[in-house]
């Protein structure tokens, strides 16, 4: 359904996407996981024909994104990262406008309106102005809009960005339901680990390159080590002691000393007894997708976001000096 080969996108000196390769099967939920600035939104913009690639090739639903962009657009739905609803129209008016743009047959519009509004539980608000909606309701309406023309592939670019945890959970309930009912292929980008767990397969992207691909279960099992987080009085000393005494590479992330080790339940008590710096707390967890990201990149996803931001600022500064 989606095939990408050696895809490249450059913005001046900045190579946002660096020769990525992947494919997505029909009916699959595929996730692009990575920090802000990793190349996720750039890739999805190319697949949706918003951007033209600098190199390589990509096809969606059998249509090449460069040679047949209109064919791609007819076959996809898109939920943008930023809100794009007209807040001075009602929910129904927004959907009808979208149906006109995609030339949905007039005889099908009323039925499809009922279906998508019921799916996202907004039937009772169809005549309400969008400006009266909460953030979660607007997101649900955007998902409904993306489904109005019955696309083969639905692209979701950071579908729950800016929403609180409870609303995020509700949005994912709707997404999982629509996948079951519509039998649609989903392609989503996210930097939330828990969202990626909803996918059949994920690709982890960092600095424009895919560093790992597989199901969440397979990727987590491949790490094979538990995660330990220490809150200590002297993080620098603890990191040095872990390196010199136990041959363990640890990182400082959000004030915690973080590292991976096999048999953490046995090693943890021993470490507390032997570590020279005072320990305020210790947390042991089974491998997560955050650990997978750290295993492949040497950083947590939050640290990677900070690095990506610095990288983009530096690139802009170089262009500004010319």
Label each PLM-derived region with a short phrase.
Residues 150:
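Conserved catalytic motifs of ABC-family nucleotide-binding domains
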Residues 154-157:
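Catalytic Walker B motif of ABC-type/P-loop ATPase nucleotide-binding domains
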Residues 169-182:
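Helical segment within the ABC ATPase nucleotide-binding domain
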Residues 225-300:
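Short, charged/small-residue-rich alpha-helical element at the C-terminal edge
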């Amino acid at each position: 359904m989606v095939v990408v080969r050696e895809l490249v996108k450059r913005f001046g000196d900045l190579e946002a996407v660096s020769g990525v390769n992947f494919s997505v099967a029909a009916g699959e939920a595929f996730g692009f996981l990575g920090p802000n600035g990793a190349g996720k939104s750039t890739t999805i913009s190319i697949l949706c024909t918003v951007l033209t690639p600098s190199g390589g090739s990509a096809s969606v639903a059998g249509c090449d994104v460069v040679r047949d962009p209109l064919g791609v657009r007819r076959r996809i739905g898109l939920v943008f990262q930023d809100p794009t609803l007209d807040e001075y129209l009602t929910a129904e008016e927004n959907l009808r406008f979208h149906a006109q743009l995609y030339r949905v047959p007039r005889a099908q519009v009323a039925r499809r309106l009922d279906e998508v509004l019921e799916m996202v539980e907004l039937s009772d608000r169809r005549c309400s102005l969008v400006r009266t909606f909460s953030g979660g309701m607007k997101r649900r309406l955007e998902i409904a809009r993306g489904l109005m023309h019955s696309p083969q592939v639905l692209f979701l670019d950071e579908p729950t960005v800016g929403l609180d945890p409870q609303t995020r959970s509700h949005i994912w309930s709707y997404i999982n339901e629509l996948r079951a009912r519509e039998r649609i292929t989903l392609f989503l980008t996210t930097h939330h680990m828990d969202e990626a767990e909803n996918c059949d397969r994920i690709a982890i992207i960092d600095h424009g390159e895919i560093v790992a691909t597989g199901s969440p279960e397979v990727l987590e099992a491949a790490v094979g080590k538990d995660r330990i987080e220490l809150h200590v009085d002297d993080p620098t000393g603890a990191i040095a002691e872990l390196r010199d005494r136990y041959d363990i590479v640890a990182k400082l992330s959000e004030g915690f000393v973080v590292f991976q080790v096999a048999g953490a339940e046995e090693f943890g008590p021993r470490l507390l007894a032997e570590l020279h710096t005072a320990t305020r707390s210790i947390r042991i967890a089974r491998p997560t997708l955050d650990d997978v990201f750290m295993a492949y990149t040497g950083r947590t996803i939050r640290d990677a976001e900070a690095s990506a931001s610095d990288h983009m600022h530096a690139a802009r500064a170089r262009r500004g000096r010319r």
